[in-house]
Structure formats: structure tokens, C-alpha cells
Amino acid sequence: MGIFHTVDDNEIKSGENTDIYFVRTSDILALEGKNPVVTVEITAQNLPDEWGVFCGLDDALSLLEGLPVDVYAMPEGSIFYRGEPVIRISGHYRDFAKYETSLLGFICHASGIATSAAIIKACAAQRPVYSFGSRRQHPAISRMIERSAWVGGVDGASSTSAPAGIPLAGTMPHAFVMCFEKPLDAWLAFDRHAPGDVPRVMLCDTYCDEKREALDAAKAGASAVRLDTPSSRKGDMRQILEEVRWELDINGFPDVGIFLSGGLTADDILKYRDIVDAFGVGGSIANAQVIDFSLDIVEIEEKIYSKRGKKSGVKEVYEFDNGDHLLLPKGVTPPEDAKPMIKIFIKDGQILTKPDMQKSRARVLSSIENMI
């Protein structure tokens, strides 16, 4: 056991990290000599919004690799709707029952973050959005947070634990500015010593009026000014942004952008996107509501079954060129222009292909262009 209250990779991969009723279920089934061949599907009956982004498949495949099962799934980054299966597993039930806890945890959390990131990115209307929220969650999962946010469409992440291939983005904390006698001294020091490829985005609300500090920063060579004004401050944020933009423009700095952060929601993005050039979003992405996936048996020994409130039998999901989906029982012929979404990823425990993070993100971005 490590020094922090976290579960290690071996405990997850071995199935030791599970709910106790799966242990008891497997033990009793073994004593009764039962281990039926089943097919299960993972679906969400309720979503935080009208649609979700499927994420976390890479971890799910790593978890199930080596088990005597076949795994089918939507490609990571797929848009899904209520009741659509995102993963399907076939095998002897006891061979994978104890992995349900970790399996659902992987995709519930990652998909929730990716979905929130995608909604916020769609609201931003082509303006850059950066993930600033890893500090709002346990540090042990910061890499997962940044990866999921990236799949959801953000343009960069603040945490140095982000996977390779994700651009790191950040400006400066208020503490940095406060370590100098004046904000100007901090900005000039940043400009002198920060790597040349780091944008000169200067934090402009530490001590003084935002428009005054923004103008001073622009004169000092800022490429953009960042406002992180807390909601407790008196005044209207829209008015503050308009004043800053006005002063920058009228004083000859129309190319100096405005970077906004500080407790932003999707509604805030919609409200300010016409005047803000880039957004840093923390809790609304990192603390996103999880997707409430559940795993249910739909076939036992090739006979269709379901519990109450669920649709029995294996299902296929098809997508049309306009983004519409069609859910059909397996074996029913779809329209000619419908493309199957569910693909095989594991055959007899062997991974056939794993998600590519960049392709997953591209899939999301191509899907959300007209979603908001």
C-alpha cells in the first residue's frame, strides 16, 4: 500500500478492486457449478445533457486484456445517446464479473469529463479552451482528467502530468505577481525569462482596476491579458470585459487578446464568447458530472434476457451522415446509408486495436460543430 489513499494498477488489473457483492456472487456461482456464457451491454439511461462523448475505452481494454472474452465498443470519441450500448462483452460470466466496478469507473468518469469538455468547446465557437481543473480532483487521476478533456476537444491542459501529445498551457498565478513589488515588475520578469514559445499572457486583476492593469500589460508587450476576477468582486463581468476591450482598442492595442478564467461554466462561455479570445476552464470540466453507465446482461446462453426497465437482446447502433443514430436489434437489416458504430476491439482476450487519443479528439471535434 502506498503513502496516499489510492488503489494501485495491480489491484485494479487483478480485479481486487471490486464491490463485495461481486466476490460473493462469484463464490456462490462456483459452489453451485454455474458459469453461464452471457452477453452484457453497457448503457446510460440518463445523461447530463442530450448527448454524451464516449471516453475511457483505452483503460477499459487494458483492464479486460487477457480475459477469455470478446469486447465490442463504439470508437472512443463517439457521440452517444440515451440507451445506446457503448460496450458489449461476451464470455463466461464469472470470468469477468468482478471487473465491473473498475470497468464502469473508467468510462463513467472519463466520459463525463469528455462530455463536459465537448459541450464547453462547442459553446466557445472556435475560440481556444484550456483545461485548468486538475487541481479540483485527486492528483492520482490528473493524467486521466487531462486526457479526457483533450478527447473532449480542449486545446491544451495546465497539468504537467498530461499525456504526451497534449500542449501544456498556463499563464501565471496571482502568487507570482504578488512576489514582486508591482505587477509590471512581474510581467517584465516573465517576459525576460519564460521560454520564447510561451505566449505572453499577463494576469491583470491582482491589485488594481482590470482595465488599468490590462493597458499597462499591453504597453509592456503582452500578447493577451488574463482576467481571473472572482465572482465575489463587485461589478458586472460583461461590463468589465467591455471596458478592457475598449481601452485596449482605443489605445492602439487591438491585437492584444483577452483570456478569461475563474469558475466558468458553459453558460458563461456563451455569454462572453463574442468578446473573449480564449478561455481557461477548471471545475466545469474536471468536476463534470459522471455518466451514469450500467452493465446489464442481455443474453444468456444465446437466449435473450433483460431485467426490468431494460431492452433485451444484443443491439447495434448505426449512424447516418447527418449525425442521426438508429438503434436496432442485432440481425435486423439497417438502411443502406446507415453505418455500424460498434466494432470489435478484443477477441479471445487479445486486443485487436486501441484508441488513438488524437483520432478520438478529431472524432469529437468533427461531431460537435453544429451541436450547440
Question: Which residues are covered by each model-predicted region?
Answer:
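A broad, low-specificity signal marking well-ordered, structured residues that form hydrophobic/aromatic
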Residues: 40, 69, 87, 130, ...
